[in-house]
């Protein structure tokens, strides 16, 4: 991991100095070239553009020019991606210094957090199972230089370290293959994180889940040789200003069950079907470090979805935690079954708001692509807060309709409902299914099936699991206010 520090001046011994350069306006004095000269090098100051120059006279540190675009267009989202480009350009150096946190007007706290996140997340790689680690970044030290706003930069740095560490933790879990991360092992990791983060942790085994009436989680697990686990985590700060419940889908590997998935590239990515639970666990682990004042309870619903002689079958009927019965029409619509039990348990505690996060539907991926997640909700106040968090974190959300006329698509002749609504409006019918288990609780469903992984390195994202939703949930909990019970 890269270490960050704050200084009022550039350290004497540093391998590279990252100099922010805007697309117009004055050139920083340390560059030593005018715009015409920079243009001959192909450097125009476009956002995320980089150009390496040799050390200035009498100096040893190389200079890395970093384009930040037009200053009027700068925000934390741009800054995060710009910092990520700087990190990749400087990955061969052991140490760098930069004044990047100070390029925006106003407080340097949020810009610094974005810079730290961009650098840390761009450099992160999951290589636990690789013998050849030669391609890893050599950058171990980053000095954030600020002569006047040292306290703000220090505060933003600490926040950025906490949030980026959480994201890296969630990425590592989601990138780990199912041969190395079962529901039981994930629960053990959750307990360890809880102990290190001041959380209360309770792990429920299969027998306990049966006794609790968690028919969704137990039913999905029926085809697996690995038993299920439900992990309850509780963060209880003094003088809490509200109570939030988070529920994460933790399907450690999703074969589709009897409704077997095709053997294509997407099937191979189904180790990431626990990305929701990974994001929730990582979020919980960051709350104390960030001194969040909201009380947060989390449920991690963990199991495989496998085919076997004992697996869930089409036509089977499950009884869920809240007593509702569900007829199975597709065993690959399993995520909603395990979330339903978690939502039922969460609603019983009467929280001020409840959020579930899941890689739930291909329909949402088809509608929104890989750059944003869908949000469906029964409460506009919760959506508004999530959208504000989305804007601050650049984890994009788009609200899809919870259109109640489509509830009839879930009707069953033999049970209260069935687990799939047909070929159309799949993201909406999945959310309508979940809505049956939240009661009157203000609730939102985050469908992260699209942005769960990245195809390549771009901005703060790296190829592989993205841990999408982690920073968003942290920000939501940190800034939470009680919404109205009305829609």
Language-model features, listed with the residues they occupy:
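A generic structural signal for tightly packed, nonpolar segments enriched in small/aliphatic residues
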Residues: 48, 187-487
């Amino acid at each position: 991991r890269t270490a960050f520090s704050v200084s009022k001046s550039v350290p004497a011994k540093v391998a590279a100095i990252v100099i922010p350069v805007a697309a117009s306006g004055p050139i920083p004095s340390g560059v030593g070239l005018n715009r015409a000269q920079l243009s001959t090098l192909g450097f125009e100051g476009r956002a995320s553009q980089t150009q390496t120059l040799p050390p200035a006279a009498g100096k040893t540190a190389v200079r890395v020019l970093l384009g930040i675009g037009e200053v009027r267009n700068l925000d934390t989202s741009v800054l995060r991606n710009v910092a990520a480009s700087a990190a990749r350009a400087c990955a061969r150096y052991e140490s760098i210094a930069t004044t990047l946190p100070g390029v925006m007007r106003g407080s340097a706290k949020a810009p610094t957090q974005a810079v730290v996140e961009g650098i840390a997340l761009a450099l992160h790689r999951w290589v636990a199972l690789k013998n050849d680690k030669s391609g890893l970044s050599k950058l171990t030290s980053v000095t954030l230089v600020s002569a006047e706003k040292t306290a703000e930069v220090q505060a933003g740095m600490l926040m950025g370290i906490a949030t980026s560490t959480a994201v890296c933790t969630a990425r590592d879990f989601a990138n780990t293959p199912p041969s190395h991360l079962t529901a039981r092992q994930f629960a053990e990791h959750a307990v360890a994180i809880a102990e290190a983060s001041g959380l209360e942790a309770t792990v429920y085994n299969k027998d306990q889940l049966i006794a609790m009436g968690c028919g969704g989680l137990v039913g999905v697990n029926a085809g697996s040789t690995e038993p299920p686990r439900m992990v309850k985590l509780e963060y209880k700060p003094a003088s809490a200003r509200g109570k939030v419940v988070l529920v994460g889908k933790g399907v450690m590997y999703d074969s589709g069950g009897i409704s077997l998935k095709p053997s294509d590239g997407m099937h191979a990515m189904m180790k990431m079907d626990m990305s929701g639970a990974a994001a929730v666990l990582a979020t919980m682990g960051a709350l104390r470090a960030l001194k969040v004042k909201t009380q947060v309870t989390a449920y991690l619903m963990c199991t495989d979805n496998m085919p076997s002689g004992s697996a869930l079958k089409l036509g089977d009927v499950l009884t869920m935690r809240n007593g509702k019965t569900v007829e199975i029409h597709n065993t690959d619509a399993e995520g909603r079954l395990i979330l339903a039990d978690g939502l039922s348990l969460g609603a019983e505690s009467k929280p001020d708001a409840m959020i579930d996060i899941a890689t739930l539907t291909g329909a949402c991926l088809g509608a929104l692509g890989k750059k944003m997640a869908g949000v469906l909700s029964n409460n506009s106040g919760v959506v508004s807060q999530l959208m504000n968090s989305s804007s601050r974190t650049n984890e994009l959300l788009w609200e899809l309709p919870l259109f109640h006329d489509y509830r009839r698509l879930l009707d069953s002749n033999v049970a209260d409902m069935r687990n799939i609504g047909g070929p159309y409006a799949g993201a909406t019918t999945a959310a309508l299914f979940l809505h049956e288990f939240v009661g009157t609780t203000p609730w939102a469903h985050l469908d992260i099936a699209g942005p769960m992984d990245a195809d390549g390195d771009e901005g703060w994202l790296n190829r592989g699991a993205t841990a999408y939703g982690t920073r968003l949930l942290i920000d939501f909990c940190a800034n939470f206010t009680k919404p109205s019970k009305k829609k």
